[in-house]
């Protein structure tokens, strides 16, 4: 049986991230906060053994990769989507200048964003890069890839069969968030999603729910026999109806949380599996009128 593990790391905060403007293949450097995030990442990654380390050739990813202190290959295939004329604009400016494109984006219609790349072009590029990486790893091999939010999210959406959804159920990548996948022949296991617990609280980027959203913190308790929050599903429905724009905490056994994570991702192929989170672990789920989104799902580091 072939077993491989790949850890994807979104780059640390860039100057464009801090300014709240679109960045695609423009080469925005790391911000002061981003450099501090790299230090936090270094403490977690520096003693981890990897058979292969790759980064996008854009400086915000390449400079984040320096946290490993080892030789890291640079590969253009791992670049962010090219957003063309959207580059350097705020969201409000994009909505004002390209209203038709924003509608097409929400409806998941194929078009070249800002005259740059289309999402199907990015999917093909990301899938090809991942296939090439897997082909280079030895049996039991581990790789780490420093790349971009759009690339990581598009790979995950492809694996769970949700590329036509808006928003993607496993999206909204945090700076230096780690997403780890284990490949066992045709089966894929999600070991961690968007894990930034290596950062101090002041360097993390908590999601602030909009008035039409509820942020649900899912805490793992006991085994299947432990009921956790009484009537788990009703608690989430009640939160959605009464706590809009707020945060609610619920608890459940690890099996139920893994099932909820899988349900959030939609009709997941049988070969994709969410591993069950450990006792005391907290995950985050965003609920709105649209498709729910899993913001955070992390497990202890698992060696293979």
Residues of each region from the PLM?
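Acidic, low-complexity terminal tails and accessory targeting/binding regions
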Residues: 1-4, 84-92, 139-141, 158-234, ...
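Generic beta-sheet signal
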Residues: 6, 141-150, 214, 245-252
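Short N-terminal binding/cap micro-motifs at the start of the first secondary-structure element
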Residues: 15-18, 224-226
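Short glycine-enriched, charge-decorated loop/helix-capping segments at active-site entrances
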Residues: 21-29, 89-91
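Phosphate-coordination/substrate-recognition cap region in phosphate-metabolizing enzymes
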Residues: 39-102, 209-282
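Short glycine/proline- and acidic residue-enriched helix-loop micro-motifs
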Residues: 101-121
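GST-like fold's C-terminal all-alpha helical module
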Residues: 122, 127-136, 140-149
């Amino acid at each position: 049986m072939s077993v491989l593990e790949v850890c994807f790391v979104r780059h640390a905060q860039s100057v464009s991230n801090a300014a709240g403007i679109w960045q695609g293949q423009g080469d925005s450097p790391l911000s002061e906060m981003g450099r501090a995030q790299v230090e936090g990442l270094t403490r977690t990654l520096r003693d981890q053994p990897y058979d292969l380390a790759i980064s996008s050739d854009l400086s915000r990813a390449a400079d984040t990769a320096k946290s490993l202190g080892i030789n890291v290959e640079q590969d253009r295939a791992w670049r962010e989507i090219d957003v063309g004329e959207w580059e350097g604009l705020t969201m409000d400016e994009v909505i004002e200048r390209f209203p038709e494109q924003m509608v097409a984006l929400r409806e998941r219609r194929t078009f070249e964003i800002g005259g740059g790349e289309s999402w199907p072009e990015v999917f093909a590029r990301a899938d090809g890069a991942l296939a090439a990486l897997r082909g280079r790893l030895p049996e039991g091999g581990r790789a780490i890839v420093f790349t971009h939010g759009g690339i990581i999210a598009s790979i995950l959406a492809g694996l769970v069969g949700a590329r036509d959804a808006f928003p993607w159920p496993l999206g909204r990548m945090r700076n230096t968030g780690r997403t780890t996948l284990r490949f066992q022949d045709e089966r894929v296991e999600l070991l961690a999603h968007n894990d930034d617990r290596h950062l101090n609280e002041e360097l993390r980027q908590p999601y602030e729910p909009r008035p039409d959203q509820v942020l649900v913190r899912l805490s793992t308790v006991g085994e299947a026999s432990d009921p956790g929050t009484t009537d788990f599903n009703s608690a989430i429905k009640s939160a959605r109806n009464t706590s809009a724009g707020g945060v609610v905490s619920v608890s459940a056994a690890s099996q139920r949380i893994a099932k909820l994570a899988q349900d959030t991702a939609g009709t997941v192929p049988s070969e994709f599996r969410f591993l069950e989170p450990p006792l005391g672990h907290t995950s985050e789920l965003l609920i709105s009128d649209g498709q729910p989104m899993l913001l955070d799902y992390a497990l202890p580091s698992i060696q293979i």
